[in-house]
Amino acid sequence: MVKISEIARTSTFAWSSDTLPILATGTVAGAVDASFNSSSSLELWDIFSATNTNEPIFSAAVEHRFYALAWSKPFEGRPRGLIAAAFENGVIEFWDAEVLIISKDLAKASVHKSSKHSGPVRSLQFNPLQSHVLVSGGSHGQIFIWDTKKFTEPFSPGSAMTPMDEISSVAWNNSVSHILASTGNSGYTSIWDLKSKREVLHLSYTGASGRANFSHVAWHPTKSTELITASDNDACPLILTWDLRNSNAPEKILEGHKKGVLSLDWCQQDPELLISSGKDNTTFLWNPTTGQKLGEYPTTANWAFQTAFAPKVPDIFATASFDGKIVVQSLQDTSPPVSEKVTSNDDNVFWNQLSTTDTQQPVFDIKQAPQWLKTPSAVSFGFGSKLVQVSKDSNGKSIINIQKFVAKGQSSSSELYTALKNNNFKSIIDEKISSNVASDLDKSDWKLLQKLAESGKDEILTEVTTEEEEKKPETEIESEDKKNGDSEDVPASADDSFFDNLGNGKVVLENEAPFVPSGSFKIFSAKVSEEDKSLIKLVLGNKIEDAVHDCIERGKLLEALVLALDASDDIKEKVKNAYFKKNVKKEVSRVLYSVSSQNITDIVSNANVANWKEIAAGITSFTNDPDDFNSKITELGDRILESKTVADSRDTAIRCYLAGNALDKIASIWLKELPALEAHLLESDNAENVSSPSEARLIALTNFVSKIAAYRSISNISGEISGPSAEPISKAIVEYTNLVAGNGEFELANIFLQLLPSDLAGTEKDRINKATGAVAAVTASKTVKSGTSAVANSVTAKTSKVSREVSSTPKPSYQATMPPIGAPLAPSAIPSASVPSSNPYVRASNPYAPHVSSTNIYKPAAPVVQAPPPAQATAVSPPPTGPPKPVYKQETDGWNDLPDTFKSKAPARRAAAVVTATPSPTPLPQTTVPPMSIPPGPKRSMSSGSAAPPPPKGSRANSKVAVPTIQSSPRPAPVHVNNRYAPPPSADVNAPSNTHSSPVGVSPSTKKNPYAVAPEVAPRVAYAPPPASLSGLGFSGGAAAPPAPPKNPYAPSASSVISPRVSNAGIVPPPMGRGIVSPPTSFGSMHAAPIQPAFSGVPPPPPAIGHQPAASAPPPPPAAKTPVPTKSKYPKGDRSHIPEKSVLIYQYLTKVLEAVKPNIPEKYTAHGEDLEKRLNILFDHLNNEDLLTDDAIEDLKEVCTALESKDIESASSLNTSFAANHIDQLGNWHRGITRLITMAEAMY
């Protein structure tokens, strides 16, 4: 129940028949309010108004009070129906509802007023089948039928069998318009037939508790022979259902009211819902068909004398009571509990809120959905062009029908698939060109594709660039030839030579003799100028360079060019530059410049695009490199497309793009035209098969991808779509593949998905692969958790691209030397005191777990001893060759986890075939189990030359290979800083067994505690010490005790750890992970035990604790002292000493936190407080400068900057990188930043 409105009136009411109904109220007769006010008013209320529902939209005073109100459905001449009022003085008045609402004038809206009744009128109802017919009943047993169209004299339905003193209720039959029922204080309910004008039947009931005194009657919404009556007798407060075919006794008796029932209403939209109210101040919801009470709504302070559903909104009903309220509420209860309404922690405020809060909630005994919320029939499209239909038979049972659905336009997709398989688009091209449905632009595109298929891309430009020459008339050519004198110089015998050289634009005649001067001449004649004399002297003196320079200075470029012909290249360039500088504004000079330099970039970029044909001819003539040609012709297409001076710029640009293999450019144009093509398909008279926008969209997308496929086939283009427009094109193709895949054409969808980059269509590819069963075989392995009893070989796998690169699983290079998966591993000649080691470069999959290498760098060079074969091999998937990508999500779901409100709704990713090898973070006591065999790793070939792999990209700067320093004794354990915010160190380690014994038994890991934080990362050392002794070392069966962990404020108290004996403190026991160490990787570094320390970052041995071991072992070093906690420089909460380099982190995080806090739901307040606490831990570290390095601070600044600028995606990515690169500096504070990013994402 949701209380929609509460009207402070003691009034009767009537609903309008509008979709959002209006409520009419009239002051009820016979009631006295607290002020003893005797006035009366008619009011209209817009309950669903968005502005103000506390005030009526109309109110007018009337002389007398009301017994009943009725509001008819719209009918002829009354668009919003009539309002009829029954007054206590026997008057019935009618108002036009529309006039009343618009004019707000009661007198103007009044259409009729009658005093036909001789006493008070108790009940009114309009006929549901004939909206203009009204029945009224009142005192003295008077019942009248009114025609509100003509307002003629009302008539009586006839004489009653048993006279009644007062009619309390009248009701029309909902199926037969001339049948009505009436009931009164005589204890009878009469059935009237207006056609025969007589009472045909009357009903009465006498039970064990007495005689029923009927107060209300209502007909079944759909069955003409069933009705229901209510008794207001306190001794017999019953609701009776009747079937007139057996009127001797009621069909059902509904018991539940403690006192008399005053009102009921049978829902017209659901015959299985009935609402009633009465003298016991209650309102009940019933199923009258079964006779069961469904629920009870909050009680009132006085009699609830009327209740009724809204005619067009049956989920809403109103109840009027004598406590001065009309409550409008909903059937369903969606209100929050009282505990959420009253939220104050202050006692005084709590009781104040409680006193003003509606604490009553409806109580439902039986949950039953209304008929309008049930689905009598349903239909749904299924994946693969399936259509599922659900319907009901005559017995109400569901019938499910699944059939194949063939969408319009699906035939085009089938033709496209055939063309793709045969690599032949000729039929599709011909069909598109001849189609009556295609637009002109679409046809022009297909014609270009046809020319491209027939002639090639070279001919596409050639036919355009040679059009004008072909159109030039022969007379014009001849006149030009005569003008130039060329025709006289070409004899008939030179025809062959002429045509051979015609393509070069010049004619060289075979018998043309070279120029040879003859006759005498003067070197210096009288007409020779001094300038020419100087030039002649320079030339004759073979000073060609000076002569050229002189010619250039005097502007004699012709002579300079002749002199430069046989000169050096520098002189030629000098002359050319002089020429171009002098004729810089001449068009021919710009063209000659590009031609002489064999680079037409200037022409392509700067020439007027109106001369695009000449530009295209130049590109064709002077560009020999295919990539350069494609680039320049595509640039020309861009300029044409942007130009407004070129006719048919769109088609011309596409022609250039086709010639330049610029598929992304062409597809961008086609993509922009998709909406226009869809509109054309919907408006075209020839497109008879297109009847909806979805069909037009499918046809347009099919046409789009068909063009792309045809062009790629014609141009022999392979590979994925790329370029600046790859993303929008890919989205359109993905949309098309979703449509055709939904029609069951998975092969066609898969073909087009292969054209798209994986980062844009990876999910769709997986979806199609699953549907077709073509998922690549990937060996799956179950993740071994820290609490399972099974022991498996643990493999840390790379999982960065598992969800997309399913079909490209690399094969490990060690495959030939390793037994098949699931087969027992051959025993290796390795010391039995060790277990197969891990790659020291591989990080733990949990970023909060300590980075511990399982390679024992302190292990002595022991003699090779053959280990016993394993009893049972464990099947694992082959590990990839690279280090893993860290995974930062912890599936703990503890009290401190982020609430679901803030979790992003990302689709579930497929689990990777990974077995993680992470030390257990919980320092709980170990359970001793009998030793069991560990399958040793395969023997490493000495001739393979395998070396440890380099660290992964992005690894920490301090993870470098360090040269070990030889020391005489093992280095003592480092003193840990007692930081209450840092996670505790790992306590789960295994001790090596006796050298000649079977492999050590492994204790089962304890279950991960969801409330405990990740363990502390041990401090790193630059140089690892060598072992104290390399011979004669024996081991006892005990394990080295871990150092005492610092107090963790977030973890529950744990039992004390049993400290077993240790035989040699100089040996670092391998860490206890979640099972036996995995097989080797292809580099062979995960199981090789080095002779001497070679890597930094390996934790030193823990302090020796326990009793003195066997006499053969050297005495252990003294136990380390308890770490002394280091006091912070500044108190907690101090922010005044945050250095300048870190203050930006503090400012940005504080700003985002203050923006997020007001939006945190109240029930997640604890999460918000925990978030702030974690950030304060970081701020304390920044203030004390005791945790983060400068590199870490800079990386964290990038995270905070992205978060402050609301770039959530970048912030999340940078935060992940930060955790991977600075794992040794993480703590409880980092979880706070991760949670802040997620909360900010939910808010923004």
From Swiss-Prot:
GO terms for biological process: COPII-coated vesicle cargo loading; endoplasmic reticulum organization; positive regulation of ER to Golgi vesicle-mediated transport; positive regulation of protein exit from endoplasmic reticulum; protein transport. The COPII coat is composed of at least 5 proteins: the SEC23/24 complex, the SEC13/31 complex, and the protein SAR1. SEC13 and SEC31 make a 2:2 tetramer that forms the edge element of the COPII outer coat. The tetramer self-assembles in multiple copies to form the complete polyhedral cage. Interacts (via WD 8) with SEC13. It holds the Pfam family SRA1. PANTHER family: SEC31-RELATED PROTEIN, SECRETORY 31, ISOFORM D. Residues 868-886 have a biased composition (Pro residues). PROSITE patterns: WD_REPEATS_1 (PS00678), WD_REPEATS_2 (PS50082), WD_REPEATS_REGION (PS50294). WD repeats lie at residues 5-46, 61-105, 116-156, 162-202, 209-252, 256-296, 299-339, 380-403. SMART domains: WD40. Residues 460-495, 794-820, 868-1007, 1066-1136 are annotated as: Disordered. Residues 909-919 have a biased composition (Low complexity). Belongs to the WD repeat SEC31 family. It is found in: Cytoplasmic vesicle, COPII-coated vesicle membrane; Endoplasmic reticulum membrane. Keywords: Cytoplasmic vesicle, Endoplasmic reticulum, ER-Golgi transport, Membrane, Protein transport, Repeat, Transport, WD repeat. The keyword Protein transport applies. One of its GO terms (cellular component) is COPII vesicle coat. Residues 469-486 have a biased composition (Basic and acidic residues). GO terms for molecular function: structural molecule activity. Residues 794-816, 991-1007 have a biased composition (Polar residues). It is a peripheral membrane protein. Gene3D superfamilies: 1.25.40.1030, Functional domain of the splicing factor Prp18, YVTN repeat-like/Quinoprotein amine dehydrogenase. This is Protein transport protein SEC31. Component of the coat protein complex II (COPII) which promotes the formation of transport vesicles from the endoplasmic reticulum (ER). The coat has two main functions, the physical deformation of the endoplasmic reticulum membrane into vesicles and the selection of cargo molecules.
